[in-house]
Each structure stands twice: as structure tokens, then as C-alpha cells.
From Swiss-Prot:
Residues 1-46 form a transit peptide. Pfam families: NDUF_B5. It is found in: Mitochondrion inner membrane. It comes from Mus musculus (Mouse). This is NADH dehydrogenase [ubiquinone] 1 beta subcomplex subunit 5, mitochondrial. It is a single-pass membrane protein.
Amino acid sequence: MAAMSLLQRASVSALTALSCRRAGPRLGVGSFLTRSFPKTVAPVRHSGDHGKRLFVVKPSLYYDARFLRLMKFYLMLTGIPVIIGITLVNIFIGEAELAEIPEGYIPEHWEYYKHPISRWIARNFYDGPEKNYEKTLAILQIESEKAELRLKEQEVRRLMRARGDGPWYQFPTPEKEFIDHSPKATPDN
């Protein structure tokens, strides 16, 4: 495309130069040596759109499209069966109804939920409130024992300082192997 435009421009300029030389000063165009012949007008093509087309460097959309395609696939793969399962549970099982509790019967913690899916989740994945209560009591007992031990340690340190029987009044003695008993030239060696 560019070669064709260049070829056309060269041919137009050559024809103009030849025609100006032949016409001479009669047309008032000027002489061939002064290079005053008219400018050539060649069409500039921009591929049919508005303005010059630029080569814009942009990142590839391959990974974005692949991610969206896979996300749609896996949503459909998991979403459709889940919707079908929830619909079947709502149609055939339905929500629980409130009834009188028989004498001496202690309901389980999941029996307080109305919907069967909530009951199933509470029964299989969550701990009961009694178990949570016992866990909290165990944590509180451990923390209270730690606090008591800290208080006892502070009291022991205070008494050791007051009576002077702490480790700061003792100096570590060197081991017997480190003592050099060989004769020395001066006492400080």
C-alpha cells in the first residue's frame, strides 16, 4: 500500500516536471531549475476509519478470557446442582414446624433450626452450645492458673530479694579442668 502511494507520488511529480518544462514560461509556472513547480497531491489512505491508525501495544486478553470462561464453567458445574438440591429439599422436606416438646426429652442443638439445610449444617459442622461453653470454661481455667503462677513467681522473687538468697549473690565457679596448675614465671600469668 505504501509502495503504491510512493510510486504514484513519484509518477505525478515526474509528469508535472515534464509538463512544466514543455509549457515553459507561457503558463507562468517557472523554470525547471528554480524548482517552482506545483506540489503534488497524493491521496493518503487511513484504512477507512477516522484518522491515522496507530499500533497500540496492549496486554493480551487471553488469560482474562480464559479465567472468565473457567469461572463461568465452574459456577455452572457447582451452581446448578446446588440450586437443584435446595429446590428439592424445599419441595419434598420443607421447613420444620413448632411442636410441643415431650416430657423428659432434651432436644439436640440442631433441632432448634427451622430449615433442614440449616439443621444439617449445624449437626455436622458446628459444635453444640454446651461444648462451646465447656471450651470457654477450660480456657478461663488455664488463664486463671497462669495468673496465679505469675503472682506466686512475683512473690518468690520479692522474698528472695528481701532475704538475700537469690541467684544474684552467687558467683559461678569455674570447672576444675579449666584451672591451670602448671608453674608460672609471674603470678599474673
